[in-house]
C-alpha cells in the first residue's frame, strides 16, 4: 500500500490536503491501496497552529469523496496514536461518534489473491433475546474470518468472528422477532468476501 504523509490542512493555501490526495491518486496507476497519513498529532498539540479535531474528521470525509472512487483511496492512517489514545482535543470522541461510528472490514487485496472463499451455509435458532447462528464452511479454500450482519428492526449491525468459531450468538435489543435478516460471508486472509449466505425468518 501507499501511505503518503499528507499533514497539511484542507484549507492550506499552498498544499491543501484534498489537492495533494488527488495528485497521489493520479499517480496510483496500479490502483493499489492508497491510505494517506493524516496529522492527528497536531490536534490540540499546544503549538501556535494546532488542528481542531474537526480537521481530521473532515480529512477522513475527503478520502471518501466520490471523485476518488476507483483510484485506490480506500482508507487513511492517523499519525500518531497519542492523540487518539488520550482523546486529545476530543478527537477520539468525535471520530467514534461520527466518521468511525460504524465498524468496517479492511478492503480486499485482490492482486495478492483474487479468488474469494466459498460461501458458508447457516442455520439459525432462536431463544430468549438472542439468536444462535451455526456456520458451516463451504468446500474449498479455507476462510480466516466470518463477517456476520443482521438487521434488528431498522438497524443493520455487523461483527467479525474468527473462522474457528462455528457458532455465534446475536443479541437483539428490539427482540428476536425484530430480526428479519442475517447475512454471513466467509473472508479470506486478504479480505476477499464470499457470496452471501442469507437467512430470513421462515427460511
Model-inferred region functions:
Residues 1-14, 24-111:
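Substrate-binding cleft of secreted/luminal carbohydrate-active enzymes
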Residues 114-123:
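Proline-enriched interdomain boundary motifs that mark the N-terminal boundary
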Residues 138-153, 158, 179:
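Solvent-exposed loop/turn segments flanking beta-strands in beta-repeat/beta-sandwich domains
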Residues 159-165:
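Short beta-strand segments within Ig-like beta-sandwich modules, predominantly Fibronectin type-III
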